[in-house]
Each structure stands twice: as structure tokens, then as C-alpha cells.
Amino acid sequence: MSEKSDSNDDKSRTRSVVYVYSPEYIQTCDSLSKVPNRASMVHSLIEAYGLLKYMRVVKPHVASIEEMAVFHTDSYLQHLHKISQDGDNDDPQSADFGLGYDCPVVEGIFDYAAAVGGATLTAAQNLLDGKCDVAINWAGGWHHAKKDEASGSCYVNDAVLGILKLREKYDRVLYVDVDLHHGDGVEDAFSFTSKVMTVSLHKFSPGFFPGTGDVTDTGLGKGRWYAVNVPFEDGVRDDRYCQTFTSVMQEVKALFNPEAVVMQLGADTMAGDPMCSFNMTPVGVAKCLTYILGWELPTLLLGGGGYNLANTARCWTYLTGTVLGQTLSSEIPDHEFFTEYGPDYSLEISPSCRPDRNESQHLERVISTIKGNLKNVV
């Protein structure tokens, strides 16, 4: 699986990269019922490909209530802490905080939220301290959580915490979200400010969660024009996605001129994901990532969605190789989860034959609208 941008190889090989990891952190993240053992699968494949030796592995700290309260309300955090200890699914207040249905209450869920929040804060702090050019937390990227409620399997919005940490040093921070779902929690958090621009490329369709993120959603008040949304229909493939991404990001860079970047790389866009929506491969996402890395700004990389666990591990391992300028063998190395990659035991993900519902003329209109909106950025 060797398709990489040659022009970026020299830069990527000299890039300083921090990888946030500890056995305890991975074990905690493995407990999330939506993606059981996914954190272990991702880390094990990265390790099996020998990529750890090219990065500085940093143990994450666990976020305190005070650190999470920089964004989340005390009442939400205190309630999450209380029910986490009890494992109480019947607390009548839980529904007010978005807990239940898609964010089930399980024992230890507060510890999970604190672990993820702390890991992203650890990554951001390493960027602030100049200890790396890129920091990675693949178990982070939970972009739906609101300040006072859980949402969409997200109990803490670690992406928002990471952005706020970077804002301690960098005046303008750009958030880029290529998850299948609209990054609504992050957009909402910064919808009234011109200091953080949010760019989300996602599926936008009636009845599809979270139901927000049309091209006309552009922010509010002082933050108007600082939210950029790129809606896609089902079936989009690498080429069309990357062309759209590049057209939008070129304009964003020129007009917003960010000083740091947070990029959420949810892998539920992959062909073969149970969401059965987009038709992408790691090669396409890597092209988007390479474009951002070419700006040579402090960059925080986060995970997100991805419900075909093997494909998610394939994707994030390939992206880790991209960051490091390492070409990875197509053959999955022998390791603890080797049997999960059958029947072909290959790193590649092939697109399916499903149709692309995105018409070129429609996407051109979307891009034109976005470029017109961005002209209002001052």
C-alpha cells in the first residue's frame, strides 16, 4: 500500500511526532460499548508495523473535573461522576443530560471520559510546549458532546478541550472534521467566536444523525462565516472527496490563516463501515491529511467514528504511516488481532461498487457557496 505524496516524504521523515499511549489508557478506551476493543486493535496494528520507534510515546494524564469544566458544565460533570459510580441507568435526571439511549450509563463511564479528555489535553500540551510538530490521540475525537449533555456516544468533547488548550498560545485555531457525521458539538462550542474556525465534511441527509451541518450553517454573531460545512450524499469516493476538500481548505487557509490545527479523522467514511454511507479508502483520507500537514503548523490528530473495527485500525495505521513518511507493507503483520483481518489479511480497503450520489454540478455549487461565504472572513 505504497501510494504517498513523494514531495512530502522528506518533511514527514523529519517531522517530530508524539503518540499518546499507555496500557491503562487503551484498556479504559476498550470498555466503550460502541467500539469494544477498538483502541487495542488500533494500537496493536500500529505497533505491529513497527511505527512506535519513529514517534515519542507519551503517557496521558487523566483529566480532572476542573480541566473538563473549562468547557463542560459542573452540573453535567457531577452527574456523570455520580451515575458512573452507581452504574445507575434509572436516575430521572440522566435524560436531561443526554444520558440513556445512544449514550448508555455504565459503571466507570466518568473514568472513560476523564481518560479521553486527559489524553487529548496531553497531546495539546506537547504541541504548546514545542515538543512535537504533530500529536496523535486515535482514541479521541468525540465531537458530538455538548457542554451540558452527552450526545452520539460522546460523553466528553475532547476535541473542544484540545482546541481550548491550544488557544492558550495560538490566537487562531482551525478545526477540520472528516468524520462521516457532522461535528456539531465542536461547531456549537465555537459558533460565536472568530478565533476558531470549524470545517466539517460529512453526510447530510434527512433523518441522518445529527441532522445539522448544511452549507447554509455558517456560525452566529461574531462567529458568523467561521463555521464551514461541506455536505455530501452517499457513495462519495476518494477522488471527488479530495478535490472538494482541497478546494475548500485552500480558501480556508488563505482567508483564516490558522496558527494551529486540530483534525478529527473518523473512519466511518470507509467502504465497509456498518454506516454504509461513504465509499472511501485510507488513501483518500491520507491525501487530505497530507494537504493539511503541508502547512507545517502545530497539528493535533484525533480519531472519532469507525465501526468496522478492522477497517478503522487499517485506516488509522495507514494515516500514522503517512504522518511519519513510512510506506507500509500490504500484508498485515502477525500480531494479537491478526485473525480479525481475514480473509485477505491486507492493509488495503477497496471501494465497493455502490453508486456515488454526489453530482459534480451540485458539489461545484456547494464549493462556490462556501467560497462566497468565506469572503466575509476578516
Swiss-Prot record:
Keywords: Chromatin regulator, Chromosome, Cytoplasm, Hydrolase, Metal-binding, Nucleus, Repressor, Transcription, Transcription regulation. The keyword Aminoacyl-tRNA synthetase does not apply. Gene3D superfamilies: Histone deacetylase domain (3.40.800.20). Its EC number is 3.5.1.98, 3.5.1.-. It is an enzyme of class 3 (hydrolase). GO terms for biological process: central nervous system development; heterochromatin formation; neuron cellular homeostasis. Its main location: nucleus. Its activity is inhibited by trichostatin A (TSA) and butyrate, 2 well known histone deacetylase inhibitors. This is Histone deacetylase 8.
